[in-house]
Amino acid sequence: MNLTNNFTLNELIYSTTAEKNKIDNTPSQPVIKNLKALCENVLQPLRNNLGCPIVITSGFRCAVLNKRVGGASNSQHLYGQAADLIVPQKNLKDVFNYIKSHLPYDQLLYEYNKTDK
């Protein structure tokens, strides 16, 4: 199911941890609605501006999966309102700054390795 031109439901719910541990990470309809809004308002506009693929490393997480990966008990991933991402062709700091200046968000976290600063 396409959520936008460049993002599918499958990529927003896929998890190797869920697959490995046989965790059903199927979202409810309200969560799918949230994921669609996330894609329409943040991820697709970001993709359009950057002009290159964005890799979602973590999107929706059901409660069992969220606990398994050590997510916060109030994580927005539980509601389909968060996505962790990388953009292999771009500098992480530049992506962060673009989101910060141009896109709507509730929380924006900049997680990096020492070499990414």
Where in the sequence are the language-model features?
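Short connector loops at helix/strand junctions that flank enzyme active sites
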Residues: 49-51, 78-82
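Catalytic cores and adjacent binding grooves of peptidoglycan-active enzymes
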Residues: 74, 79, 87-117
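Structural recognition of the beta-strand scaffold that forms the well-ordered cores
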Residues: 54-57, 82-86
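Generic non-transmembrane alpha-helical segments
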Residues: 41-50, 94, 98-102
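Extended, low-complexity, intrinsically disordered C-terminal regulatory tails
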Residues: 43-70
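Short coil/turn segments at secondary-structure boundaries
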Residues: 30-33, 73, 86-87
